[in-house]
Amino acid sequence: MNKIWLILASIILSFNAVATQITDGKQYKTLDKSVAGEPQVLEFFSFNCPHCYQFEQVFHISDHVKKELPDGIHLTKYHVEFLEPMGKYLTQAWAVAMALGIEDKISVPLFEGIQKTQTIKTDADIRKVFIDAGVKPEEYDAAWNSFVVKSLVAQQEKAVADLQLQGVPAMYVNGKYIVNMQGMDISSMDVFVQQYVETIKFLIDKK
């Protein structure tokens, strides 16, 4: 995983994308056991993960995927709690963002505060991010303790266990396939991103 990100970080952008055949074992892998009931396109990440920061905020791969998804299909993002510090707290905070429908407002400041400025170190710092994003303090506190948020936390934890997640960032399709970044063409960033997106689209249509 580290190697792929070091290479991607050194790539000069190129606009000469090349179509590539998508095959099992290369751009994606079929899970040994499929998991029913998961979102059709599911990304796992952690605000504590430097590679997730690059994936989201530097290369904007998730944004490219979202733009290219067919109508009616959405990208769902789950936070993992196995990366510290505050892994479990950040997962619950992400559940609050999901419940309030403000994931896009929260994602950037949390990533920046943890990975770049290192100004987020406590639960109070996380709470302040929500308040700065326009959430009333009492609304945040109520959501934090709500049944909906607790259910979303459990949902994220269950998906991690059911899919036997090994690391982040990771993207799954239909509970059957995981995208394999190590098998992507990394001759340029544009080629890599295009192939990543095309792999997702291919897997959505795959029976």
Residue map of PLM features:
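Structural alpha/beta surface segment adjacent to cysteine/selenocysteine redox centers
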Residues: 47, 53-127
